[in-house]
Amino acid sequence: NSLDNKLVIDEKVAGTKLKVEGSGEIGDKILAGKATLEELAGTAKVGDKTASDEVGTQDGIIAGKMSAKVGDDGKIVASTVKRAIQQHNQAVSSMANLSLMTWRQENNDMNKRLGEVRASEGSQGIWARMARGQSKYGQQGIKNQYNYYQLGYDSKISDDWILGGAFTYTDGDSNYTNGSGTNKHTGFAVYGSNLRDDGSFIDLIAKYAHMKNDFDVNGGVGSGDYSTNGLSFSAEYGKRFHQEGYWIEPQAELTYGRVSSADFTTKNGASVHQDSMDSLVGRLGFSLGKDIKQGNVYVRASYLYDFQGDTSVTMSKGGAATSFKTDLGGGWWEFGVGTNLDLGHDTHFYLDVETTAGGDVDTPWQWNAGVRYSF
């Protein structure tokens, strides 16, 4: 643990190799510029000469493992220096990115939120929905299983427009190599939907949420918790074309989201700074459906692309610091199947199941169910 400790060797047999390995604490000091690999090599001596042929350090709180070869002159051979990533801290970085991942997953089109609102009668409506799913991300094999709840009310303010609001709550449990975590969002949304007789619609929604995250990592900076805030604004346009009981509905949507920065200290005393994260997701897609006596059934497909999505997490302690950059931007596909059913008595039920493919964040499954009562 200390460079003051010395290994004095009386004689080194020809052909033998000696490796001196320092603790993670020494690795952190080297990363902070308070010590050097050459000083570590010099802790083993034969007479007044360095006996080390190779040096290395274990994982520190901030620094990953280091290694290097030592020349005959006792100096480090620069071309052999290797610095590994502290895997536990990379997991913490990935956990911090869950805020953006889960916030982006809460983006939803009008049909997911309200079901077949066109079929609703009455000037007002109350509705509730729940979504449950799983997402996967990163080299650490992070799996986040989440539940998403909304409770809303809306009212017609004209022949074409309805205006409403909703309370939202999300809770998730994540697991990954050497750790686990939880994430919770509490917030609200306001929306306006324009539904026209020609089958076209415009849907506008703004959302806010307060996010709480905690993680427990075996090693590195250790465990911690923090809070941040998320905002998003979305606009969607679509038009339904009917033909003999079947219909197709092209859709286009643009969503901007932002998760604010956060600063916190872990249980191991490390300071962590998470940069703010921006997301700008464009979506082009369609749904293809068939009208049935009780409502309709449909399949849908969309291509989504996040034009932003990059962020970084910086961890530091005692002058040692490391940063992890992540880019969640890029495109992915979304496929779904669902139904909207008239249960009678001004009540409608809707169910949707989806999966994604081709993106950095994979959602193998998610189901979404809701009920709406109009009066």
Predicted features by range, described:
Residues 1-10, 14-159:
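Outer-membrane translocation/initiation segment of Type V secreted surface proteins
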Residues 89, 122-125, 129-375:
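Membrane translocator/pore-forming domains, dominated by Gram-negative outer-membrane beta-barrels
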